Regions:
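Core SAM-dependent methyltransferase catalytic element
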Residues: 184-195
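N-terminal auxiliary segments of SAM/dcSAM-dependent transferases
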Residues: 1-24, 34-39
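A short glycine-rich, Lys/Arg-flanked "PGG" loop and its adjoining helix->strand segment in the class I
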Residues: 139-151
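Short beta->alpha hinge that forms the Motif I/post-I loop of the SAM-binding pocket
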Residues: 87-90, 137, 160
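Conserved SAM/SAH cofactor-binding pocket of Class I
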Residues: 44-127
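Conserved class I S-adenosyl-L-methionine
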Residues: 160-175
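Class I S-adenosylmethionine-dependent transferase superfamily signal
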Residues: 74, 145, 172
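Conserved beta-strand signature within the Rossmann-like core of class I S-adenosyl-L-methionine
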Residues: 152-160
Length: 195
């Protein structure tokens, strides 16, 4: 059986490799492995998300962190951020924590199915949601996210237009104070929803 990147305990054979990623004016080396999302490089959607963000402050949650490029690169760019990275995938969480530390970034890396093991409030939550898990799963994540945002806190998501960005925007507008598209690039929409 093949593992999905949102499998909690991947059983696929390890295939560890090192890649270099440049974004936000910083460059970092990352270890990746089989059984995690986009193990060969920073995926286009995540790059679009990263490059569309305003300057960030406070406490940040990288929800569905994978091998940790978002939290690590943001931590390198904004060293005063308090960063929590989470993923349902145990292999991804281990890689994310190691990658952050190897690049001099202090983070808390937590294995969690959405918010199951996440405590506290966040000023910013970022996610490239697991589209293949289905609309019910990702909309549930979006709804639960609001309860973990400070007043005025922001959720940033990246989603392909053809994979449901218009309906996700509509849903977010119905449940958040505001929601808007802040970037459209290469078929991806970056949506910011404010609690």
């Amino acid at each position: 059986m093949n593992d999905h990147y949102y499998t909690a305990e991947p059983t696929s054979a390890h295939d560890i490799r090192t890649i270099r990623v440049s974004a936000l004016g910083v460059e970092a080396a990352f270890r990746t492995d089989a059984g995690v999302f986009s193990r060969d490089d920073l995926d286009v959607g995540t790059r679009v998300l990263l490059e569309s963000l305003p300057e960030l402050r406070g406490r940040l949650l990288d929800l569905g962190c994978g091998w940790g490029p978002v939290g690590t690169l943001l931590g390198m760019r904004y060293p005063d951020l308090t960063i929590v990275m989470s993923d349902v995938n145990s292999r991804a969480v281990e890689l994310a924590g190691r990658n952050a530390r190897a690049n001099g970034v202090s983070v808390q890396a937590i294995q969690s199915d959405a918010f199951e093991n996440i405590e506290g409030m966040f000023d910013t939550i970022l996610t490239n949601p697991p589209i293949r898990a289905g609309k019910a799963v990702i909309y549930g994540m979006f709804l639960n996210t609001k309860a973990h945002l400070t007043q005025g806190g922001k959720l940033y998501i990246v989603i392909r237009k053809q994979q449901g960005a218009p309906s996700a925007l509509k849903m977010l507008k119905e449940h958040y104070e505001s929601a808007e598209i802040i970037e459209r690039e290469k078929g991806f929409w970056v949506i910011c929803a404010e609690a």
